[in-house]
Amino acid sequence: LMCCQPPNNSNDLERNYIKNIKLIDSAPASLPSIGITGGEPTLLGDKLFSLINHIKAKLPETEIHLLTNGRAFADINYAKKLMQCGTEKILLGIPIHSDCSSDHDYITQSKGSFDETMLGLYNLERCGFDVELRIVLNRITCQRLPQMANFIYRNLPFVRYVAFMGMEYTGFTIKNHDLVWIDPIDYQEQLESAVCELNRWGLNVSVFNLTHCVLNENLWKFAVKSISDWKNEYAEFCDECALKEKCCGLFATSRKQSKGLQPIKVILCE
């Protein structure tokens, strides 16, 4: 319902694979991290492992951030193939949309996806991988954020990071506006409850893609500068904000923004 990079009918897997190999070959050895995203990277099948092995050979000190829905790893043999690439310097970012399978499957528009993602998460843990669990904040997911936090603590306490992520308003999100759009200022109570509970339980929790001005002040310390440089921007009035240097800014690709955007003025006590 909210995919920011909707699928198209072109079969460009092989062309993009070759292009990516060339990009890796031209990357500086000092590159701190490299992201593998899509679409869905596991659609490459075993070529995904060839790509990862190529990165590890050419850029041995570079961290790999693999963004995937995790479903392919429900097959333990596929997870073990990734393990053969080595578990070091790989972080898998995997979304979970609800503690209820029906809500998760509705958002993905794929029946059974919740069960596959959960099994994939457990298989990746068995294989020794670090996982960043991602919860994209929309009208559906925000209804059960405290319950989601409890579910994560009880069922997925092994994840390395938990990231609550502001939604990029582009792609299918525009088409499904009435189903998924909610202004961030309208879910702050639920978000604060979920984040603070996970933090209290000792999980490493962050808030991505949300400006400080739309967050409750108690959440500022969890906010991360998370938006990629190529699609990051700030409004003109952000120059007046005392927290601009700490703030993630906005998606340049988003067609809609929160009505709560405003510069934050800090008054120092004399």
Mark where each language-model region is:
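Residue-level signal for well-ordered alpha-helical positions
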Residues: 3-6, 107, 244, 253-254
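A short, conserved beta-strand element in the Rossmann-like catalytic core
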Residues: 42
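Radical SAM enzyme [4Fe-4S]-AdoMet core and its adjacent flexible, acidic
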Residues: 11-14, 106, 110-222, 233
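Canonical Radical SAM [4Fe-4S] cluster-binding loop centered on the CxxxCxxC motif
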Residues: 1-17
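Short, histidine-centered active-site or binding-site loop motifs used for metal coordination
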Residues: 4-7, 98-100, 168
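Flexible mid-to-C-terminal extensions adjoining Fe-S/redox cofactors in radical SAM and related proteins
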Residues: 216-270
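Radical SAM/AdoMet-radical enzyme domain recognition
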Residues: 21-35, 45-165
